[in-house]
Structures are given as C-alpha cells and as structure tokens.
C-alpha cells in the first residue's frame, strides 16, 4: 500500500490518541526532565481520550476527574524519579486544603531526591500565573532553576518562569 492509496477509514474506529503540542519552552535540554515531560504528556493524552467533556458534568468536576485519573496512571507507571508520594504532593501543611498549603500534580526528583521539575495539569482556559509559579517554588523549597511545566489541554505544554525582577510566562496559543 502506498501513500497514494491509503487504507479506507472505518467509521467509529479510533486511529490516534490526542497529542499535546510541546512548546519548545517546556523542554529544558536535560534529558531526564525532557524524557519525563514527554512520557507525562503521553499519559495525559491517554487520560484525555478516555473522558468526554459534557456540559452537564461542568468544568470543575471534569477537571477533578482528569486529575484523579492522571494521578492514578502516573503512580501505576512507576516512572524513574516519581515515587507515589510525588504525585499530588501537598507542601506547606499537613494535608491539602490547609490554609497556606499548595498541591503539585507531579514532582520529578533526581537520584539523590532533589526536586528537579514540577508538573501542573490544567484542564481549563486559565494557566499558571507567575505569582502561582513563584508560590509553588517557595512551598516546594526550590529556586528558579527548577522548571514548572504546565500541561494544558487548550495550550499544550509550556514552561513557567518567575524572575525576581519581574515575571513572565511562556504560553503556546
């Protein structure tokens, strides 16, 4: 079979999963982080393909369902540098919801246990603001050298930066 005469399309068949656009800003040049970013993007794409947004579900419940399924899938994968407690980790309090606490979706650690990347899933239109990126870094006890990688349905994957002199973010539109 050649490209000139492709196979017939079968109605109702699924041919490819959702693919996330990975903005170049989401890639760090560090293979451990970049390989994990790609694996997590594929995992989130598979999760997205299993959930259909319906108006009666509402955006908040849809987001909760996606986050829960993604967390379960990431824990089950056993990816290097991501232990089960590194998924939906709460910083700044004993439990999620405590005043002043923050929750990260996924933390990636190096071989000695240092946080080397923070991943945040977004299912709606709102992305990570520079103030939120700074708060995540502060509560996780890391500096600006640790990338915060936004995994967003509307915008793909992008990296968030917070600089002491000011703030900016890189978005894929």
Q: Positions of the model-derived regions?
A:
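Catalytic toxin/effector domains delivered as secreted proteins or via bacterial secretion systems
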Residues: 2-173
């Amino acid at each position: 079979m050649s490209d000139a005469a492709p196979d017939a399309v079968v109605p109702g068949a699924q041919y490819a999963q959702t693919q996330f656009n990975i903005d170049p800003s989401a890639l760090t040049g560090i293979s451990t982080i970049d390989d994990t970013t790609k694996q997590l993007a594929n995992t989130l794409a598979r999760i997205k393909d299993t959930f259909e947004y319906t108006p009666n579900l509402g955006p908040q419940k849809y987001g909760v369902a996606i986050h829960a399924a993604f967390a379960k899938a990431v824990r089950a994968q056993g990816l290097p540098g991501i232990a089960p407690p590194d998924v939906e980790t709460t910083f700044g309090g004993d439990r999620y919801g405590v005043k002043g606490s923050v929750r990260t979706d996924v933390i990636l650690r190096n071989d000695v246990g240092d946080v080397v990347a923070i991943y945040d899933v977004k299912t709606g239109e709102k992305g990570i603001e520079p103030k939120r990126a700074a708060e995540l870094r502060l509560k996780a006890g890391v500096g600006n050298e640790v990338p915060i990688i936004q995994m967003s349905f509307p915008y793909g994957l992008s990296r968030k930066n917070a600089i002491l002199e000011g703030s900016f973010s890189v978005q894929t539109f």
